Amino acid sequence: LLAHTLLIDDTRSIDGYSPSWQRWFAHVGVPFNKNTAFKRFGQSNMVIQAALAGQGIALGRSALVVDDLISGELVIPVKKAFPSGFGHFLVSPKNRSRNPSAREFCRWIKMQAELSQTKIHWLLRDCFAKV
């Protein structure tokens, strides 16, 4: 892996827990080589596009790359997942919780999230088993 160009998303989260190659290598117990070739990008989608174009290997958020992995456009070169600890929450004002449109939207978004989670779990089942 260290012989390849590593693609970096320079976007930083507020809490400082954005995935990074240094953290990934520490997570899997491999010494990080600072002489490794890097390409830096300012947005997650640019990193994904660079990986799709064959410019290097990227750390990708599973929800953003799951369809590319399923289609075979991208592959998982190392079966070691790195859980980010990020989560999503669906909230609404209390006075709108009875609104039929809001309830329907909540039902739909939960269904989409469950479908996405099912795809991700199926795709990454071997990655998490070996961590």
Spans of features found by a protein language model:
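Hydrophobic hinge/microswitch elements
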Residues: 31-76, 83-84, 98
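Structured beta->alpha junctions
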Residues: 10-13, 39, 81, 94
